[in-house]
A protein has these predicted regions:
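Alpha-helical solenoid repeat scaffolds of the TPR/TPR-like class and their adjacent stem/linker regions
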Residues: 1-518, 523-602
């Protein structure tokens, strides 16, 4: 507790008010006005009629000695700003700007309830402030009070119909409830009122790619946003990412490189992490692997990368491979299950290189499978943030960082998954034994217009399903009810759908994959598991879609996987999807001929 506010200390010092007054005066001389005001209030709490304390407090209030708060705000020292403002509340409580400033500080501190209260007080003092009503809407929206937030934004527009930001926020609400047509309408109204509203432009760009699958329109919006705000890292990342997703990686890299040269010194840490992460993906896709790993290191605070707040981990983070020698290392999972299975192909090489003891945090669905696959590793579901028995921690994908894994290194990564040989399945046993077992998936479990560009439809694979020499086995996880409607009844009956949960039962999936002669699909968990299990696998992806090809996907229509040499890739585009199907049929024919000695023309 601060010695100035210690009740016992006040009681002792109250015997000599002069001592307290001297302290307060010294505080004033040093510019410590909030602390001086605090002392005067403490004196007056015991001696309300003390003339010197009252007079000194009045002089401070009259002089309005509030320091320049901008440096503190820029440094995000919001607690200090709050303290200074609250020390002046008696003097300034009738000033709406005071409440607006205090509300903005609480908003930055994510205390949206107090922010709302402050802004409501400010609105009472200045009812015509449309920007203030807009901020109240933002406070309500942060608290998921969508209905009242909507009303607040509408009220702001009644007061000022040309206030573009309210249209932008109303569009955000419509987007939140997935009414994308109305959302786009509001964002278009926003840029009609104010063409430089970069937030509305950004939303329009995201909507164009995410919900419409229109890269060209998205690119146009992001380019305009970057023209208006060239120093905003989000505008840089958005535009560079659109070029990256269209396979125009050179343009993507040019944007990243030019933006970094102009703006790097001004970027805050969180934005720097997002920039580096997205930049690293373009570098990997271009084949600049070592530089990509350097940039990739900074990804840990990027949204949806790590399942926990890594700043709370008290264990030292492993920064270079030399420190890992003979140490006890905790591997913390990141991103999704497919990413886990993919990255762990480097674990055996890491252990051999460092002679380290590994504690492997795993997703519950993978616990038994990974424990069997890595018998020398301690597999855990959770860990203590300050475990003193752990020397270092690292995220899964830092295996590549530490090993500087690149196309020139051979036999570093490879299949490692071991299925349970004691596990049996009546469903698998009933598969016709005289046919080729082809397991396949066609899309991700999460679908929107943007992601569909990277995937296919079930009906695209009708020729493989209807082939009489093939057991076409569904490996697509999730609800496929709507997908099945794409097929005629005859093919729906022929598609073999396992009797277990493909999303959660990885042990049964491992058994089924082991029975397959070939597995194919997009870069999702079933195909990744097949590759990591050593099964002959074909993964199809967009030209820009395989950053882990380390440049191969931009150069070749087909190539061998750099991580698992039992896996091959086919590059495709939506405009030429028929070519993808033809090439996949050739793979199936080749496998059939190898197995039977006879050609099978699909």
């Amino acid at each position: 507790m601060n010695k100035l506010t210690n009740p016992k200390k006040l009681k002792d010092d109250a015997q000599d008010v002069n001592a307290l007054m001297r302290k307060a005066k010294n505080m004033e001389k040093n510019g410590q006005y909030p602390e001086a005001v605090e002392i005067y209030h403490l004196i007056l709490s015991k001696y309300p009629k003390n003339k010197r304390a009252n007079l000194s407090l009045k002089k401070i209030n009259d002089a309005n000695p509030v320091p320049n708060l901008l440096p503190l705000i820029e440094a995000k020292r919001f607690d200090e700003v709050e303290k200074i403002l609250l020390s002046n509340i008696e003097r300034d409580n009738q000033n709406p700007n005071f409440w607006k400033l205090l509300g903005s500080i609480y908003y930055q501190m994510k205390n949206y309830s107090l922010s709302l209260q402050c802004n409501q007080k400010a609105l009472e003092l200045n009812p015509g402030d449309y920007a203030l009503m807009h901020q109240i809407g933002c406070d309500l929206l942060e608290q998921d009070d969508v209905g009242n937030a909507f009303k607040a934004f509408k009220f702001a527009l009644v007061t000022n119909p040309s206030f573009s930001q309210a249209h932008t926020k109303i569009g955000e609400i419509y987007n939140k409830i997935q009414d994308f047509v109305k959302a786009e309408y509001e964002w278009l109204k926003a840029i009609k009122v104010d063409p430089s509203d970069t937030l509305a432009l950004t939303y329009l760009g995201i909507n164009a790619i995410q919900n419409l699958g229109d890269c060209a329109k998205s690119q146009k919006y992001f380019e305009t946003a970057l023209e208006y705000e060239p120093h905003d890292v989000n505008n840089c990342v958005n535009l560079a990412t659109i070029f990256y997703e269209q396979g125009q990686n050179e343009k993507s890299l040019e944007i990243f490189e030019n933006w970094e040269k102009r703006n790097w010194a001004d970027i805050e840490d969180q934005k720097k992490a997002e920039f580096r992460f997205n930049y690293s993906l373009a570098l990997f896709a271009d084949g600049q692997v070592s530089l990509g790993w350097q940039m990739f290191r900074g990804r840990l605070t990027v949204d949806k990368i790590m399942p926990i707040d890594v700043t709370k981990i008290k264990i030292r983070k492993l920064e270079n491979i030399q420190d890992a020698n003979s140490k006890r290392i905790l591997l913390v999972m990141e991103q999704g299950v497919g990413d886990h299975l993919f990255q762990l192909g480097l674990l055996k090489q890491f252990i051999e290189s460092t002679q380290s003891k590994i504690v492997l945090q795993v997703e519950p669905r993978l616990e038994s499978l990974l424990a069997r696959s890595f018998p020398e590793v301690e597999v855990v579901l959770d860990f203590d943030l300050d475990d003193e028995n752990i020397d270092y921690w690292m995220p899964y994908a830092d295996l590549g960082v530490m090993l500087d894994f690149n196309p020139n290194i051979q036999a570093v990564c490879g299949p490692y998954l071991k299925r349970d040989t004691k596990l049996t399945s009546n469903w698998v046993k009933k598969l016709p034994s005289d046919k080729l077992n082809v397991g396949f998936s066609w899309r991700s479990g999460l679908i929107d217009a943007r992601r569909l560009n990277s995937y296919t439809y079930l009906s695209d694979w009708a020729s493989i399903i209807e082939n009489q020499d093939i057991n076409a086995i569904c490996l697509q996880y999730g609800d496929i009810t709507e997908d099945l409607k794409e097929l005629p009844q005859s093919l729906q009956k022929k598609l073999l759908i396992p009797d277990f949960n493909l999303k959660d039962d990885f042990e049964s999936l491992a058994l089924l994959i082991d029975e397959c002669d070939l597995v194919f699909g997009p870069f999702t968990a079933p195909s990744i598991q097949a590759a990591a299990q050593g099964k002959e696998t074909v993964i199809f992806n967009l030209k820009s879609g395989d950053r882990w090809s380390f440049g191969e996907s931009l150069k070749y229509p087909e190539y061998q996987d750099r991580w698992y040499n039992n896996c091959n890739h086919i590059v495709f585009s939506q405009a030429e999807k028929i070519n993808l199907v033809d090439r996949m049929e050739n793979y199936v024919n080749n496998v059939f001929q190898r197995k039977t000695g006879f050609a099978n023309k699909l």
